[in-house]
Design a protein with these regions (language model features):
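Charged, gly/pro-rich active-site loop segments
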Residues: 2-20, 88-156
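A generic local secondary-structure boundary/capping motif
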Residues: 31, 79, 127-131
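Short solvent-exposed loop/turn micro-motifs enriched in small/polar/acidic residues
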Residues: 35-37, 49-51, 83, 97, ...
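Short beta-strand segments
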Residues: 37-70
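Short acidic/glycine-rich loop or secondary-structure boundary segments that cap or lie
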Residues: 52, 65-67, 74-77, 99, ...
Length: 156
């Protein structure tokens, strides 16, 4: 039996980055910021693994609406669970690549297919697809949990 103490686990030295701090956003402010950008990422489960797709969106009465391509993985997932929906996360951000300042928001909730003809037509006019392919459907994400943070310059 070896009674020597186990060696301490060490890693790279701690790094302190001056000049920036993170501030948590309220859910209302996070949703407001989400409404100021057009592009985000939807995260859903595919074959028990996370799948991420860039999509454009709009914010409508607190819901996130995206268009979905016919025959896409996400469209098939929602078609398999009509009315029930699937749990998704939606992330959008605006972070300056040089200054590393900005914000990021994640909304988690259930996504359901929009089926009312009037709504589908309305969103078809408001939210234009930006990739090739047939896009006739739309999805509504009702956020249950909204989190976000802002990257700011440090207080001096």
């Amino acid at each position: 039996m070896n009674s020597d103490p186990a060696p301490a686990i060490t890693g790279p030295p701690a790094v302190r980055v001056p000049g920036r701090r993170m501030e948590e956003l309220s859910p209302d402010e996070a949703l407001r910021l989400l409404g100021t950008v057009e592009l985000g990422r939807i995260v859903f489960t595919r074959h028990a693994l996370p799948a991420v797709r860039p999509v454009n969106h709009l914010l409508d009465a607190g819901d996130i609406v995206i268009r979905v391509q016919d025959g896409s993985t996400l469209a098939a997932l929602l078609a398999a669970l009509p009315g029930t929906g699937v749990v998704v996360a939606y992330e959008a951000d605006a972070i300056d690549q040089g200054a590393h300042l900005g914000w990021s928001v994640v909304a988690t909730g259930y996504a359901t297919a929009i089926t009312a003809p009037g709504e589908i037509e309305r969103y078809a006019h408001l939210l234009q697809p930006w990739v090739e392919g047939t896009t006739s459907g739309a999805i509504r994400i009702r956020p249950d949990l909204v989190t976000g943070f802002r990257l700011l310059e440090s207080r001096r």
